[in-house]
């Protein structure tokens, strides 16, 4: 049993450390812990916090920008719809105005054409009447000249016959003038 006690004592002797070594280990651990805490952990924690804040601010800014972009897109879509409606209304109004203008222009052109036709017909009637009166005057003048020549020839032969022919001729001229006046009045 002695052996057993001694071997157990040797076994436990190696397990229980020396107090000085244990104290030095604890002190070195504390120094290392403090060193790591102040020089590694805290700066790393600050850097991670700054980085996290930086990323979070960018995420928030991105979300805010997306919301603003959606609002602007909605506004743009609304303005686009309003512009399309305005263009459609403007197109319809311009077509109505153009059709109205065309109708007015057609009406004016038709009225002007009718007026020109009426004036042209009046001018033609006046010209026709003028030509007729000139024609009748030429016929009368030619007839008078023929009669005068005939009468001059007959004057030598028979003065009485000449006077009766002149009287008849004057009557005939008056009838023709009256009939031409009647025709002129009838033609008008």
Swiss-Prot record:
One Pfam family matching this protein: ATP-synt_B
Transmembrane helix listed as a keyword: yes
Domain of life per record: Bacteria
InterPro entries given in the database record: ATP_synth_b/b'su_bac/chlpt, ATP_synthase_B_chain
Gene Ontology terms, MF aspect: proton-transporting ATP synthase activity, rotational mechanism; proton-transporting ATPase activity, rotational mechanism
Transmembrane segments: 19-39
Keywords: ATP synthesis, Cell membrane, CF(0), Hydrogen ion transport, Ion transport, Membrane, Transmembrane, Transmembrane helix, Transport
Localization of this protein: Cell membrane
CDD domains in the cross-refs: ATP-synt_Fo_b
Chief subcellular location: membrane
Protein's UniProt keywords contain Ion transport: yes
Membrane topology term: Single-pass membrane protein
GO cellular component: plasma membrane; proton-transporting ATP synthase complex
Quaternary data: F-type ATPases have 2 components, F(1) - the catalytic core - and F(0) - the membrane proton channel. F(1) has five subunits: alpha(3), beta(3), gamma(1), delta(1), epsilon(1). F(0) has three main subunits: a(1), b(2) and c(10-14). The alpha and beta chains form an alternating ring which encloses part of the gamma chain. F(1) is attached to F(0) by a central stalk formed by the gamma and epsilon chains, while a peripheral stalk is formed by the delta and b chains.
PANTHER family: ATP SYNTHASE SUBUNIT B', CHLOROPLASTIC
Function description: F(1)F(0) ATP synthase produces ATP from ADP in the presence of a proton or sodium gradient. F-type ATPases consist of two structural domains, F(1) containing the extramembraneous catalytic core and F(0) containing the membrane proton channel, linked together by a central stalk and a peripheral stalk. During catalysis, ATP synthesis in the catalytic domain of F(1) is coupled via a rotary mechanism of the central stalk subunits to proton translocation.
Family label: Belongs to the ATPase B chain family.
Listed name of the protein: ATP synthase subunit b
Organism: Mesomycoplasma hyopneumoniae (strain 232)
Gene behind the chain: atpF
